[in-house]
Amino acid sequence: ITGTNGKTTTVTLLYRLFTTLGYSCGLLSTIANYVGTKGSEAVNTTSDPLTINSLLSEMVNAGCEYCFMEVSSIGVEQERIAGLKFKVGIFSNLTHDHLDYHKTFAEYLRCKKLFFDQLPQDAYAITNMDDRNGMVMVQNTKAKVVTYSLRSIADHTCRIVEQSFEGMLLRMDSRESWTPLIGQHNAYNLLAIHTTAMVLGADEEETLIALSTLRPAPGRLENMRGPKDISVIIDYAHTPDALENVLKTL
């Protein structure tokens, strides 16, 4: 997955989802790297090529069937993922970030788009239609394009039926599912996860049941209950868009 916000939550929950569904999986993320159930600390969102390929080799030897990975714009630009063949590429959203490195938003967008330009023909390019750059990302890809949206007609859709501090009731495509996650941005993350599971051939009912058991990724809108029923929210938000999403949710 690539995008400004939502990468860590999406890959972490995909890893947990497919583990729950009975698959042996790997995870390469901002928070941690996992080979099956064996975890190690991560240094960068997208590690250097030697580290990535070493971990992928460990995953193969451990019998992992899937690896869910965050792909940063810097990682793409520096060719840290060169030579890797992705089965699925997901685009979450694009807002201002890393402009200290890329200098311009156009260059930031170009690096994100390059990830999809390089996907093979037998891959899937999953994109958020509600982001103004969603279709730009996949306009030159050779992969099969699959869309998701909370606002318009798409291959996979979602609507928030109810929400509170305890979670949300979502209508995912034509079926309802409860989740302990909160906030519209998490509805987008869960829809991207659901869409990915569907293109990878997972059973829809089993997927929705498993999604309802998934807790937030560490430091991603975690709701902690304090004394006297006081709620404490822990969140990593460090971009204007991410902070706005958190404050709107609260």
Language-model segments: what does each one mean?
Residues I74-E77, T157, E244-L247:
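Glycine-rich, charged/polar anion/phosphate-binding loops
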Residues H238-L250:
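AMP-binding/adenylate-forming catalytic core of the ANL superfamily
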Residues T45-D48, N186, T239:
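Short, conserved glycine- and acidic-residue-centered signature motifs
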